[in-house]
């Protein structure tokens, strides 16, 4: 009886693995959009001096800003930059 249960479980796993579908690859534009929305918001110089009322229009990028983005903070940081499009 135990071997019958093992066979049933193995068949169920085989069906689950065989019927799994691969995700379609996203285009570069879709990836850029999703990455830009996953970042940590930051306040650009244009948002004003008060952080509590700022709109936080920038996104923190590790290293430097990617292509199509510009640095929007006046201070320099080696680790990350506050960037916006």
UniProtKB/Swiss-Prot annotation:
Residues that make up the propeptide removed upon maturation: 21-36
Primary residence: secreted
Tissue expr: Expressed in ectodermal glands and in clumps outside of the extodermal layer. Is not expressed in nematocytes. In adult female tissues, shows similar expression levels in mesenteries (gametes-producing tissue), tentacles, pharynx and physa.
Keyword Signal: yes
Signal sequence segment: 1-20
Swiss-Prot/TrEMBL keywords: Cleavage on pair of basic residues, Disulfide bond, Ion channel impairing toxin, Neurotoxin, Secreted, Signal, Toxin, Voltage-gated sodium channel impairing toxin
Keyword Secreted applies: yes
Disulfide bonds: 42-82, 44-72, 65-83
Parts forming coiled coils: none
A Pfam family assignment: Toxin_4
One term of GO molecular function: toxin activity
GO cellular component annotations of the record: extracellular region
Compartment list: Secreted
Domain of life: Eukaryota
Family designation: Belongs to the sea anemone sodium channel inhibitory toxin family. Type II subfamily.
Miscellaneous comment in the UniProt entry for this protein: Nv1 toxin seems to be encoded by 8 different genes. 4 of them code for identical precursors, whereas 4 others code for very similar precursors. In the genome draft, 6 additional loci are also correlated to Nv1 toxin, but they are not predicted to be functional genes. This high similarity may be explained by concerted evolution.
Function summary: Binds to site 3 of voltage-gated sodium channels and inhibits the inactivation process. Is highly active on DmNav1/TipE (drosophila) and is only extremely weakly active on rat Nav1.4-beta-1/SCN4A-SCN1B, and on human Nav1.5-beta-1/SCN5A-beta-1. This reveals high specificity for arthropod over mammalian channels. In vivo, when released into the medium, this recombinant toxin induces impaired swimming, paralysis and death of the crustacean A.nauplii within several hours. Also causes paralysis of cherry shrimps immediately after injection at very low doses.
Name of this chain's protein: N.vectensis toxin 1 2
Species in which this protein is naturally found: Nematostella vectensis (Starlet sea anemone)
Taxonomic lineage of the native organism: Eukaryota, Metazoa, Cnidaria, Anthozoa, Hexacorallia
